[in-house]
Amino acid sequence: MNQSEVLFAQARTVISGGVNSPVRAFNGVGGNPIFFTRGKGAYLFDVDGNKYIDYVASWGPMILGHANQEVINAIKTNLENGLSFGAPTHIETMLAEKVCELIPSIELVRMVSSGTEATMSAIRLARGYTGRDKIIKFEGCYHGHSDALLVKAGSAALTLGVPTSPGVPKDFAKHTLTLEYNNINQVYEILKEVGTEVACIIVEPVAGNMNCILPIDGFLQGLRKLCDEYGIILIFDEVMTGFRVALGGAQEFYNVEPDLTTLGKIIGGGLPVGIFGGKCEIMKCIAPLGPIYQAGTLSGNPISMSAGLAMLNVLSKDKNFYTTLNIKVQKLTKGFLAKAKENNIGMTANVVGGMFGLFFTDAKSVTNFKEVSQCNVELFKRFYHLMLEEGVYMTPSIYETDFISSAHSDMDIQNTIDAAGRVFAKLV
């Protein structure tokens, strides 16, 4: 047994399943998870002394690479002042101002401690504001693990094969209508029946929890139009896409403005944090201004706020940051596709901003959950473990997106492409 296997066995004796988030258990690819000791730049280092080029990026937040010095310095400075006060701090306001500056649809925000909290609170707000109960979400999209949203969910719920989790009461699930992502006609038809009962439509503008599925032309625009027509709150779940697709998020990239937005991951610079925000008229309904309750002991934690502010300051300094990031992703995915073609392996890729998804399929495009599920999962599993042997760490599920960071060099990308070529040759 290597040291990761020893530690995983130890973890299983005191942690349920040996992990604190299901996808980390490697159920989607088989084998045992890797235990890491540190990260620096584009690299991760495990307990057995192995070095990996990292395309998981802590599931998105590490857009500047691991242990970015400006973020680390901000954390160190604020650590000396104390960890948590349970009271207002100026740095909360500073981060809120930065978010409102970068995402024009957000006029007021509320800090929370996770993406799940953000989406849960945004939906409660939408229900309280509209006085309606039903919500619409899309198959394969993941919005955290609150009960109302674990109905045909994405991410690890798909990997486990239980997209609708046991423990979700039928009375909760009956208010959640789950439709096909990228099918605006289906939304149109269901709203003709129950449009006046729907409080909100929540959507990942890029569905990053069933791999990387991009919105087809007119889908997001159609949602905006239908929400306006029926008085429905449009919520963009940008926990993954916020500051990852563009500086103003996917809503800037696709030029569609939601009523409410949820953020996480990058917004905390790698520390636990979530934010929801949007139009003043809606946000003023939250306590203490309004009757809709939301609270949290660690909300606005000064250490998380300092990390998030430092990261956003770095991202907003370089006007070419996202262009450069996308060039790297394009080079990487074109390299993957070229090597796959050389070995007669069917593959397609989706790319947006600093996100990318690889699909083992002969289809020319993949646009929804059903098409993702038709990809060759057994081939992916073999590919995954062979890439690990080559020192390349990718997300361990066909239903997860991969990420690139500004720390990835041209050599890192070329080394990854070369590794993929050797792996594809073994898959034939």
Swiss-Prot record:
Q: Which enzyme class, named as a word?
A: isomerase
Q: Which gene encodes it?
A: hemL
Describe, as the record does, how this protein assembles with itself and its partners. Homodimer.
Organism name: Vesicomyosocius okutanii subsp. Calyptogena okutanii (strain HA)
Pfam families from the UniProt entry: Aminotran_3
Q: What is its main location?
A: cytoplasm
What are the subcellular locations of this protein? Cytoplasm
What's this protein's name? Glutamate-1-semialdehyde 2,1-aminomutase
SUPFAM superfamilies per record: PLP-dependent transferases
